[in-house]
C-alpha cells in the first residue's frame, strides 16, 4: 500500500519562488567587482533570475545545455544559479584558481555553450578563448558603463541582456532528477572529473544545510559565505538561503582581513563559512589591529582539517564557535558537521577542543562506515581506522561522461579515499588521505596529525607534512612550514615541539622553511607539488 501524498517535483526554481513569496523583502548584500555595495531583496532576485532565464532562451539555450560561470560571490552570480537551472539548463561553475590548461579542458569536456565572467577574469577568458571548442558567446557580468574593450568578437553585456527581458518568465515543470549544476573536482591526479548534481539532490542538500545541527540558517541570521560559489556551489548555501529567509551578505573579490571585517561589522553578520587558510589570515588581522566582529557567533570551517590552535583561538580570544564540516565535491558537499552535544558544551576546554578537531557526526541523509583493505566493516570504537565510505541521496554515483565506469562498490557505497575512525557517539575523525599516509618501518604515520601539531606552534602560519624516501625505513616524514611574519625559530625548536605529543618515531626528521606553500584552487596545500620538490 502506498501513501496518499501529492508528488511534487523538488526543483531549484521552487526555492527562490518560495523566498520571494515568504521572505520577499529580505536583503541580499553584495560587494561588487566594480566597487560599490549592492543591495536588493529576495523578490528582486526572483524577478532578475526570470530575466536571466528569458535572456538564455532568447540566445537559444535549451534544456540540458551547459552554461558556465567564472565569477565571485555576488548578486549576478546567484541570479545565474537560479536562472540557468530554473529554465532546465545546467549551471556549470568554474574555479578561476585552476591552471588555464585545466579550465580549457573542463570547458571543452563539459561542452559549455555560453560563458559568463566577472570583469576580474576577462583577461583569463581572452587568453583561453581561442581554444574553447563549443563556447558560442561570452557574457561579461557588468553594465554598459563598465564594459571593457576587448579583442573578443562574441562579447555580450549582462545588464543589456537582462534589460531586453520582462520578469514574467514561467518556470517549467520537469523531472526532479534532471541535472541542475555541474562542478569539477580539482584533478590533483589526472584530469578533473565532472560531478553532475540534480535538482532533487540540491534541494534535499539545502534542507540538510539549513538544519539547526548544521548551519542553523533562519530569518534571524545573517550569513556571509567566504567559501566561493565556484567551489561546490558554496557548500549549497545559495539554495538554502531563500528556503530559510536568511539575510545573505556576499564579499565579492575582497577576501582580505580588512575587507571581510568591515563588511561583517557593517551588516552584523552572525555566521560564516570558509576554508582554514582564509580564517588564519583573518585571525592574524584581528590580532594585529585589535579588532573583531562582535555579532559573529559561528564559523563553519571545512575544505581541510581545522588546526586545534584555530579552534582555540576563535573560542578563547573571540568567543566564536567553530563547527568543523567535512565533505567532498561528490557529496554536494556536506557529509558531516561537528556540533558539540549539549553535555559536551560544559566540558573543560581541553576535552571540547579534542572533540572539535574531529570532522563531526554524519548529517541526516548521509551514511558512513569504515572498512579494512578487504572491505570488511570495522567497529565504531574510535580506534579502528580504515577507508571511509559514504552513501546518500546527494552522493554521486558516477562522473559526468563516465557513467559506465564503476565508482560505487557492490552495495552502493562511494569510496572517499580518506582514512578515518568513527567513535561510539558517531564522531568521525579523518586521520589522512590514503595517498598522504606515511608508512615508516611498517608503521603508519598521519600527516594531518603532525600538521595540526605544527600549526599550534606560535611561530608557524601554515604547515604540510609529506613522506620522503628513506633507505632504512622506506619513508620518513618531512615538515614544511611557512612562518609568521618576523618569526625565526630554529629547526631544533620546531622539531622539539613534537616531543611528548606524538611517538618519537613519528616525529619528522627534518623541517624546511619556505616563503609560501603551494595552494591549489580549492584552498588546500598541493602535496603533489611538494613531493616533486622534496621527495
What is each model feature region?
Residues 203-222, 232-270, 285:
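Conserved AMP-binding/adenylation subdomain of ANL enzymes
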Residues 98, 104, 115-117, 272, ...:
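AMP-binding/adenylate-forming catalytic core of the ANL superfamily
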Residues 66, 72-92, 96-100, 108-114, ...:
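A short helix-loop-beta submotif of the ANL/AMP-binding
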Residues 15-17, 58-59, 86-160, 174, ...:
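Structural core segment of the AMP-binding/adenylate-forming
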Residues 362-389, 424-425, 487-491, 526:
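Conserved beta-loop-beta connector loops within the AMP-binding
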Residues 56-61, 166-178, 182-224, 236, ...:
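Conserved adenylate-forming
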Residues 243, 266-274, 283-354, 367, ...:
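Gly/Ser/Thr-rich phosphate-binding loop
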Residues 28-74, 78-82, 99-104, 154-160:
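Conserved AMP-binding/adenylate-forming core of the ANL superfamily
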Amino acid at each position: 500500500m502506498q501513501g496518499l501524498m501529492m508528488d511534487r517535483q523538488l526543483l531549484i526554481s521552487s526555492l527562490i519562488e518560495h523566498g520571494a513569496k515568504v521572505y520577499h523583502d529580505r536583503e541580499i548584500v553584495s560587494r561588487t567587482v566594480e566597487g560599490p555595495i549592492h543591495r536588493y531583496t529576495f523578490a528582486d532576485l526572483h524577478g532578475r533570475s526570470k530575466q536571466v532565464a528569458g535572456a538564455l532562451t532568447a540566445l537559444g539555450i535549451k534544456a540540458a545545455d551547459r552554461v558556465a560561470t567564472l565569477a565571485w560571490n555576488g548578486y549576478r552570480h546567484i541570479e545565474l544559479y537560479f536562472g540557468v537551472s530554473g529554465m532546465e539548463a545546467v549551471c556549470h561553475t568554474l574555479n578561476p584558481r585552476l591552471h588555464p590548461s585545466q579550465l580549457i579542458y573542463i570547458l571543452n569536456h563539459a561542452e559549455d555553450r555560453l560563458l559568463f565572467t566577472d570583469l576580474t577574469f576577462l583577461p583569463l577568458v581572452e587568453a583561453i578563448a581561442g581554444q574553447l571548442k563549443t563556447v558560442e558567446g561570452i557574457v561579461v557580468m557588468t553594465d554598459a558603463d563598465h564594459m571593457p574593450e576587448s579583442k573578443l568578437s562574441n562579447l555580450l553585456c549582462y545588464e543589456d541582456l537582462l534589460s531586453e527581458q520582462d520578469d514574467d518568465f514561467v518556470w517549467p515543470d520537469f523531472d526532479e532528477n534532471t541535472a541542475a549544476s555541474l562542478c569539477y573536482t580539482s584533478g590533483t591526479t589526472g584530469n578533473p572529473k565532472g560531478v553532475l548534481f540534480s535538482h532533487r539532490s540540491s534541494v534535499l542538500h539545502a534542507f540538510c544545510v539549513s538544519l539547526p545541527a548544521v548551519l542553523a540558517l533562519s530569518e534571524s541570521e545573517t550569513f556571509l559565505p567566504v567559501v566561493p560559489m565556484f567551489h561546490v556551489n558554496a557548500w549549497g548555501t545559495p539554495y538554502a538561503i531563500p528556503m530559510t529567509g536568511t539575510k545573505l551578505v556576499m564579499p565579492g573579490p575582497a577576501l582580505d582581513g580588512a575587507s571581510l571585517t568591515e563588511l561583517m561589522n557593517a551588516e552584523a553578520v552572525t555566521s560564516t563559512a570558509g576554508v582554514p587558510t582564509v580564517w588564519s589570515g583573518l585571525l592574524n588581522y584581528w590580532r594585529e589591529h585589535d579588532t573583531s566582529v562582535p555579532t559573529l557567533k559561528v564559523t563553519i570551517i571545512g575544505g581541510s582539517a581545522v588546526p586545534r590552535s584555530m579552534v582555540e583561538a576563535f573560542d578563547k580570544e573571540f568567543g566564536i564557535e567553530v563547527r568543523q564540516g567535512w565533505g567532498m565535491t561528490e557529496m554536494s558537499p556536506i557529509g558531516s558537521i561537528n556540533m558539540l552535544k549539549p553535555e559536551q558544551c560544559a566540558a573543560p576546554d581541553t576535552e571540547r577542543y579534542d572533540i572539535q578537531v574531529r570532522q563531526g557526526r554524519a548529517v541526516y541523509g548521509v551514511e558512513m562506515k569504515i572498512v579494512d583493505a578487504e572491505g570488511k566493516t570495522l567497529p565504531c570504537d574510535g580506534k579502528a581506522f580504515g577507508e571511509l565510505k559514504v552513501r546518500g541521496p546527494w552522493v554521486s554515483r558516477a562522473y559526468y561522461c563516465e557513467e559506465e565506469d564503476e565508482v560505487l562498490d557492490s552495495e552502493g557505497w562511494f569510496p572517499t579515499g580518506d582514512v578515518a575512525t568513527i567513535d561510539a557517539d558517531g564522531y568521525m575523525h579523518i586521520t589522512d588521505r590514503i595517498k598522504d599516509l606515511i608508512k615508516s618501518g611498517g608503521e603508519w604515520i598521519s600527516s594531518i596529525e603532525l600538521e595540526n601539531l605544527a600549526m599550534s606552534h606560535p611561530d608557524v602560519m601554515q604547515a604540510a607534512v609529506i613522506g620522503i624516501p628513506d633507505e632504512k625505513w622506506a619513508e620518513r616524514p618531512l615538515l614544511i612550514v611557512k612562518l609568521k611574519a618576523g618569526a625565526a625559530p630554529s629547526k631544533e625548536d620546531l622539531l622539539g615541539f613534537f616531543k611528548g605529543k606524538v611517538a618519537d618515531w613519528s616525529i619528522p626528521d627534518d623541517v624546511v622553511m619556505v616563503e609560501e606553500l603551494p595552494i591549489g584552487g580549492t584552498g588546500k596545500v598541493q602535496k603533489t607539488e611538494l613531493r616533486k620538490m622534496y621527495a
